């Protein structure tokens, strides 16, 4: 197994109110799924101490990498979770380097979503196997406290394993071992072939959708339909009442929710270029997202009553921000 240790930027450490996410020491590894002859670059963060911990598996967006979600990966680690950032070959930064915009458009084909879902299942299989074998730190992992998150195409991946329905049946997508989900920049079906309730009504576990007023469509209307902030927010309306939430951030764009991910693409690809005022607000947005998502995981994976109480009316929201939950 290939491994190199990284030292992240130093900042305020925790997930509690007022904290700023930081990138903590992490290990970059390569995990190979022999059954598919597929090697996944991984970034792995362990929480300090010896206590039992939950696990969160994060999926990057199109053209991203295991660096996706770094902005909150450290905060989730500080909240008591093992955090695993998965890189998906075929829809990652290497695909963009090899083929540019055309390769990323091709990466939205169904076979890449199938591969991504299988990647997530393989990672959870590995978590389970290592935990049951009680291999070193893996003996700490609570198999009843696994969550999944993703940004953009990673959110599409998370929607699939959470139970989203498709016009064509997609057997084997649902991952029952995940107990809660966070989708950054989620999206409904572009063609609207199913109603929102038909698409998302079967998701029966806690699901947090996160978007913002500038969260547009980097692919600019692939398939003839352009996704906008309101369509991303509409995912909430399709989810069953009782275990759903929506965080809307005023002035946050699509790249805000990548969590420092696709910076290298942003410098080369027009749709990712940002207004200076959006970038200036990003640190505050990242801090708020890190805190609220940390509380979400603690409430729904660890049964933390204080975190659940904080989510009833999260502090720190601006006048243009919105929080909905029921």
Where on the chain are the PLM-derived regions?
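Serine-hydrolase catalytic machinery in alpha/beta-hydrolase-like enzymes
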Residues: 35-141
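N-terminal export signals
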Residues: 5-21
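Alpha/beta-hydrolase-fold serine-hydrolase catalytic core, especially in secreted/extracellular enzymes
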Residues: 250-255, 260-326
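Glycine-rich His-Gly loop
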Residues: 58-62, 151-152, 186, 212
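A domain-start/cap signature at the N-terminus of enzymes
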Residues: 16-46, 316, 320, 326
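Primarily recognizes the serine-hydrolase "nucleophile elbow" in alpha/beta-hydrolase
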Residues: 125-202
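The feature captures the conserved acid-bearing segment of alpha/beta-hydrolase catalytic domains
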Residues: 172-251
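Short beta-to-alpha linker loops that shape the active-site pocket of alpha/beta-hydrolase fold enzymes
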Residues: 87-91, 187, 252
